[in-house]
Curated annotation (Swiss-Prot):
InterPro entries: Ribosomal_Su5_D2-typ_SF, Ribosomal_uS5, Ribosomal_uS5_bac-type, Ribosomal_uS5_C, Ribosomal_uS5_N, Ribosomal_uS5_N_CS, Ribsml_uS5_D2-typ_fold_subgr. Residues 1-26 are annotated as: Disordered. The N-terminal domain interacts with the head of the 30S subunit; the C-terminal domain interacts with the body and contacts protein S4. The interaction surface between S4 and S5 is involved in control of translational fidelity. This is Small ribosomal subunit protein uS5. Residues 28-91 form the S5 DRBM domain. PROSITE patterns: RIBOSOMAL_S5, S5_DSRBD. One of its GO terms (molecular function) is structural constituent of ribosome. With S4 and S12 plays an important role in translational accuracy. Keywords: Ribonucleoprotein, Ribosomal protein, RNA-binding, rRNA-binding. SUPFAM superfamilies: dsRNA-binding domain-like, Ribosomal protein S5 domain 2-like. Disulfide bonds: none annotated.
């Protein structure tokens, strides 16, 4: 009897999981970063297709990217979107609007610099970086690309910079300090930087 009950519970969970996944997917926002025409040389000639790059996020601190290839554009976008959903990562955000600290990212020849910004700054970043920030839910940030303008390299470099973000609680626990000590230092540093800018 106990085994039968366990099996029934397992079946119920299996039935509930797809619904939960559907609800989660419905909350995600996707953006098409770029699409290219590709060709594969085979014995009989060339097979042409399309490669799509898509970023997906819930605008609450989770985002991912994916790349898909297919003969038709819609199918390539669908594959890229599905891959992006499987690659979702959570990025800690300060006040749910900006980054906790500045960061650098790199992938191949792509290099990006991301800087936390005060309220009202907006998203000062172009192209692929802006798409990533919008699906992630970042409202105030300054981003700059210093390397390759290849969309794929820029997206990978942006995520490399984002994955380096650390929550003040995590940093405080590792250093044996209080959260207020970490936040206080950050505030003091920002005020000093503001004073230096005003003097210059």
């Amino acid at each position: 009897m106990a085994e039968e009950r366990g099996e029934k519970r397992g079946r119920r969970r299996d039935r509930e999981n797809p619904r939960d996944r559907d609800d989660e997917s419905s909350e995600l926002v996707d953006k098409l970063v770029g699409i290219n025409r590709v060709a594969k040389t085979v014995k009989g000639g060339k097979n042409f297709g399309f490669a799509a790059l898509v970023v997906v996020g819930d605008q609450k601190g989770r985002a991912g990217f994916g790349k898909g290839k297919a003969r038709e554009v819609p199918e390539a976008i669908r594959k890229a979107t599905e891959e992006a959903k499987r690659n979702l990562v959570r990025i800690p955000l300060r006040e749910g609007r900006t980054l906790h600290h500045d960061g650098n990212g790199r992938h191949g020849a792509g290099k990006v610099v991301l800087r936390a910004a005060p309220p009202g700054t907006g998203v000062i970043a172009g192209g692929p970086m802006r798409a990533v920030m919008e699906v992630l839910g970042v409202q105030d940030v300054v981003g700059k690309s210093l390397g390759s303008s290849n969309p794929y390299n820029m997206v990978r470099a942006t995520f490399d910079a984002l994955k380096g973000q650390a929550n003040p609680r995590t940093v405080a626990s590792k250093r044996g300090l209080k959260v207020q000590d970490i936040v206080g230092r950050r505030t003091d540093g920002a005020s000093e930087a503001g004073m230096a800018d005003s003097v210059n």
